[in-house]
A protein has these predicted regions:
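Transmembrane beta-barrel strand/turn architecture of Gram-negative outer membrane proteins
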Residues: 1-4, 95, 108, 131
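Repeated loop/turn-to-beta-strand initiation elements of outer-membrane beta-barrel proteins
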Residues: 7-9, 64-67, 99-109, 140-145
Length: 145
């Protein structure tokens, strides 16, 4: 979606069961559901519900500078038989400033924040990092002068 001449919005929302293989962060599609009243099959495999969304805004400041800022979330509804340290929720946010001094050269800096919560063991971890990148695009076709 282009909300303005210098902006591009990218968004996605998804919900499903057993689709974790389609996600980068979510590791398990099927969880153990306890059914202790059933002596023949006291546990069964169930497709785990997952909800996820992401939203990013790309902005062109001028011919030499651009930025992206955004956020994403993935959250699993865990089954009661999963381990306490099973993946439950992950979050990711980033913002950058890119500089294009020449047509084939880009340099930029980005701040990234990540977070993970486990199912039941109370584990929570987050980290913030700064990343610096330089990219030069080049090409040459052999046999052409």
């Amino acid at each position: 979606i282009k909300p303005g001449t210098k902006d591009v919005f990218k968004g996605l929302a998804i919900y499903g069961e057993g689709i974790q293989n389609l996600m980068n962060d979510a590791p398990t599609d099927i969880g153990i559901q306890n059914d202790f009243g059933n002596t023949v099959s006291p546990v069964k495999g169930v497709a785990l519900p997952i909800a996820s969304f992401m939203a990013y805004l790309d902005h062109s400041w001028n011919e030499s500078f651009s930025s992206s800022v955004g956020y994403s979330l993935v959250q699993i509804t865990n089954s009661d038989g999963q381990a306490a340290d099973a993946y439950h929720k992950g979050q990711y946010a980033s913002a950058n400033l890119l500089y294009y001094p020449l047509p084939n050269l880009m340099a930029g800096a980005e701040v990234i924040w990540i977070s993970r919560d486990n199912y039941k063991d109370g584990f929570h971890s987050s980290a913030t990092k700064i990343q610096v990148s330089v990219r030069y695009n080049f090409s040459h076709t052999l046999g052409k002068h």
